[in-house]
């Protein structure tokens, strides 16, 4: 259901979801626990963020002093397109935060993006010190003025529109910046994304609680989501197919999996039901259908589910490649295709789901 909802959102362009404050707090805490000074004297850019509505801006503004930030920059897209699609969704307590500000100009407000800034001064800084002004353009992250802000920043943190995710990743990697973004687990299989994971330039973050991500949405798009996905009491939608993607280090990433031997898995792992590990028809590797069934004593290539990346420890395994489609690309797959035809991993002529090929580091 989660994957289907991401697809529906992308197709309908209803792809602006507002991240919950506790989810942001939980994720950021994982990096602070690993390195308490991770944000000290740094500039953070929050693009695609709609500061009037965003918990990202609220969170970092409220914790500006706690984190020792140098500067916080948050940009929003022009109000006209947002109001047309979604209606108003203010998260700041004062709903007149913009319209009563001396900078407010009703004749250009709908067409111009905004930039919100908070800068280190010789006094305690809090959210009330947040200043804003209009951008020259509409605030699109691809514009030259937002690119300049990107180049100024040390960190880029946001929940980019799902429909522009590939474009955003390309924009992000035009520079060598630290980043933390939200995306679909499906994005891992994109040809623009997986090589970054393979080369250890991007990995999964700490993750959402119990694998569930909840986002605020406007009521007028709630009809797009099934019962059990949208909660009309909270105005939240739930996705299970959602993750944080980052190049910031965190402790869980370096926790090796506790694994059983091949023989013990066959004997005790209830998911395997006593079955031997099988080799693929078309790749020199064995099929491991569950992450917790990876054998500790197997040194050759294994195919594992995409969800393995939630537990991936780079000191324990190396990622060789991935196959998720019928087409074969040696640069992506990383293994030789032994039989011509459908390149998806197969066992006894039956294809599996997408698989990542890994090998234990000796």
Q: What are these model-predicted stretches?
A:
Residues 1-362:
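Class I S-adenosyl-L-methionine-dependent methyltransferase catalytic core
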């Amino acid at each position: 259901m989660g994957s289907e909802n991401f697809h529906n959102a992308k197709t309908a362009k209803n792809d602006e979801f507002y991240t919950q404050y506790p989810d942001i707090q939980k994720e950021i805490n994982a990096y602070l626990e690993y390195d308490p000074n991770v944000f000290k004297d740094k500039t953070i850019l929050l693009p695609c963020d709609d500061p009037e509505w965003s918990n990202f801006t609220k969170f970092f503004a409220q914790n500006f002093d706690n984190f020792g930030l140098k500067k916080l920059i948050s940009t929003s897209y022009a109000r006209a397109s947002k109001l047309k699609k979604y209606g108003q969704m203010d998260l700041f307590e004062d709903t007149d935060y913009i319209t009563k500000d001396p900078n407010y100009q009703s004749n250009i407000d709908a067409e111009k993006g905004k930039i919100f800034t908070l800068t280190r001064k010789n006094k305690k800084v809090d959210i009330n010190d947040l200043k804003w002004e209009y951008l020259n353009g509409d605030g699109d992250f691809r514009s030259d003025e937002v690119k300049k802000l990107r180049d100024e920043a040390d960190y880029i943190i946001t929940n980019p529109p799902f429909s522009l995710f590939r474009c955003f990743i390309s924009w992000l990697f035009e520079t060598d910046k630290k980043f933390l973004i939200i995306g679909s687990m499906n994005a891992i299989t994109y040809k623009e994304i997986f090589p970054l994971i393979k080369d250890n330039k991007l990995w999964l973050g700490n993750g959402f609680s119990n694998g569930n991500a909840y986002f605020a949405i406007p009521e007028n798009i709630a009809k797009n989501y099934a019962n059990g996905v949208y909660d009309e009491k909270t105005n939240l939608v739930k996705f299970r197919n959602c993750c944080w993607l980052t190049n910031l280090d965190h402790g869980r990433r370096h926790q090796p999996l506790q694994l059983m031997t091949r023989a013990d898995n066959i004997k005790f792992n209830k998911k395997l039901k006593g079955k031997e590990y099988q080799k693929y028809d078309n790749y020199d590797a064995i099929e491991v259908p569950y992450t917790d069934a990876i054998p500790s004593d197997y040194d050759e290539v294994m195919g594992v589910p995409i969800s393995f990346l939630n537990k991936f420890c780079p000191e324990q395994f190396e990622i060789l490649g991935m196959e998720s489609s019928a087409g074969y690309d040696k640069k992506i797959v990383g293994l030789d295709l032994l039989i011509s035809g459908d390149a998806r991993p197969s066992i006894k002529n039956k294809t599996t789901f997408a698989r990542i090929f890994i090998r234990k580091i000796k």
